[in-house]
Amino acid sequence: MKSSMNRREFLRSGVCSGTVVAIGYHVNSAAAADLKSPNEKLNIVAVGTGNRARADIDGVASENIVALCDVDANILGRAAENYSSARTYRDFRVMLEREAEKIDAVVIGTPDHSHAPDAAMALRLGKHVYCEKPLTHTVFEARTLAELAKKNRLVTQMGTQIHAGDNYRRVVELVQTGAIGKVREAHVWVSVSYGGARFTTGSPVPKQLDWDLWLGPAPERPYSEGVHPNYWRYFWNYGTGVLGDFGCHYMDLVHWALDLRHPTTIAAEGPPVDPVGTPPWLIVRYEYPARAELPPVKLTWYDGGRRPELLGELRDRHGKPLDWKSGQLFVGEEGMIISDYGRHMLLPADKFADYKRPESFIPKSVGHHREWIEAIKNCATTTCNFDYSGALVEAVLLGNVAYRSGQTIEWDAEHLTVRNSREAQQLIHKEYRKGWTL
């Protein structure tokens, strides 16, 4: 029977569903059969318009950008110059309320602490969501967004654009076809450091900035120079440190290749905990349980210049040390793979000199933003939907929980509970400022 629902009504009805698969996005064919031409453009609004958010807006510019929102009038104005037909707002809540009946999807590129309220409101309104990494500021928020997306059957994507690269796909293929045997150990490291954060006082709020809206759900406090627009990542109230910022990119590959979701034990070490600022360095040790035929995995994260000791023992095919500033190292029973965003290498180099790589089975990405757009139009799901990326972000943020609590935590993912530490449990979520809700 022919449906009387037109395409735009269909897109807004929230009927898209599907199960994520590692090789691409899965189409709900029964529902998609009713869709008209995918050439019809989506109506999209953006929350946040500066820095990375601007790249996200440009990434979906093939569609109709109907409204832009930013708490900084100067940044908003610069973005609006390129999207002159877009209506502009300062408060995302006002924008979503006024535009709800006109839009299909929302792109979110705000500081970490405001991701979840923005995304939750959009999902409850039945809008498809693209949200920058890390998906949320707390573990509880990540679980909440994943559940909302599933309940409302919406197409979601976390902004980890490295996931769309060819290099990650080739590494996943090597690991999953057994090139280095079973993997029980992995290391991830980055050289970045975000330590030394301090609030300042006495500076007036810039005229173009609505500081109250910028704070959003965070605790109320006087304006602090430098926090906006660049250094909020250094503060616990707004950011998630190096681990939250880069873990979503680098740990993504390990989660993807080894089919990881929820660790059961997390321990962290670093300098004494600063209640204000994130640490200049951190080491986190995760333990993941067995998955079907796959063995348990120990994954170690390093930042701020710390790196795995094993890295110092490795050599390339010319015998030179592998002095990689950032990367991933998979340690298998029959060899190793070292990788980063754009390269990878099988080790020992002499053992794999004549290795014949498996035939590629993960299709080339159409682009991280494009994948989300096409998934919406074809009633599909994406490779970094909130089910996959939510679990990844939960694991990433649990490293911060372990560090800040000073505890080796035993994690019950099903019940979202730290079994052995009341202090750590209090860090699974946060109290929202009056007037703000998840």
Task: Describe the function of each predicted region.
Residues 1-18:
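N-terminal secretory signal peptides and thylakoid transit peptides that target proteins
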Residues 16-83, 162-165, 254:
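N-terminal Rossmann-like dinucleotide-binding module
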Residues 32, 170, 182, 187, ...:
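Contiguous beta-strand/loop segments that form the cofactor/metal-binding neighborhood of enzyme cores
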Residues 87-91:
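Conserved SAM-binding strand-loop segment of SAM-dependent methyltransferases
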Residues 94-101:
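Short amphipathic alpha-helix with an adjacent loop that forms part of the alpha/beta core around
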Residues 106-107:
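N-terminal Rossmann-like NAD(P) cofactor-binding module of classical short-chain dehydrogenase/reductase
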Residues 111, 116-164, 178:
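Beta-strand-loop-alpha-helix segment that lines the small-molecule cofactor/substrate pocket
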Residues 157, 173-174, 183:
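Hydrophobic or amphipathic alpha-helical targeting/insertion segments
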